[in-house]
Amino acid sequence: DIVSPPVCGNYFVEVGEECDCGRPGKCQNPCCNATTCKLTPGSQCADGLCCDQCRFKGAGTECRAARSECDIAESCTGQSPECPTDDFQRNGQPCLNNQGYCYNGNCPILDHQCHNLFGAGATVAPDACFNFNRRGQGIYYCRKQNGVTIPCARKDIKCGRLFCVQ
């Protein structure tokens, strides 16, 4: 790794800087002093999804819309210029009229997964096929913990290996 001291005017906010809008004469941000890389008097912020005209946006102001029913819209805190970390509905939450289950902000539907993997004629296999995932052996499991496969609980059998038929 290369270690170098902070450089005011390089557009990167580094240790000791509150903002960095480029070199004096190039800076177009009224919230940032380009010579010192400090906020201008009265400014709370210079950049960020929750910064507007040098002030923090109010608490509850949406800064990132939900992309799907498995995503959660994020709102400004009123204390920071940054939008909070992207958050999702809990994994396993039913979605799309119980056709799928939320997973990391998406709603994968088993039929769509089969179609994408095996072509237009592929569909999800009968429920009985998914009972293999309760074994916790070989390729049939829900998760691994310390290298050991963990079988799926009855309610989670469709969270393990995907079974499709042509």
Curated annotation (Swiss-Prot):
First-tier enzyme category under EC: hydrolase
UniProt: Ca(2+) binding residues: V7, N10, F12, E14, E17, D20
Residues that carry a glycan: N33
Keyword flag Phosphoprotein: no
Residue ranges of the motif D/ECD-tripeptide: 69-71
Annotated compartments: Secreted
Disulfides per UniProt: C8-C37, C19-C32, C21-C27, C31-C54, C45-C51, C50-C76, C63-C83, C70-C102, C95-C107, C114-C164, C142-C152
Keyword Ion transport: no
Gene Ontology MF, one: toxin activity
Signal peptide segment: none
Organs and tissues of expression: Expressed by the venom gland.
Annotated family: Belongs to the venom metalloproteinase (M12B) family. P-III subfamily. P-IIIa sub-subfamily.
Quaternary structure (record): Monomer.
Reported function: The hemorrhagic metalloproteinase-disintegrin-like bothrojarin-1 is a potent inhibitor of collagen-induced platelet aggregation by blockage of alpha-2/beta-1 (ITGA2/ITGB1) integrin. It does not present any fibrinogen-clotting activity.
Name of this chain's protein: Zinc metalloproteinase-disintegrin-like bothrojarin-1
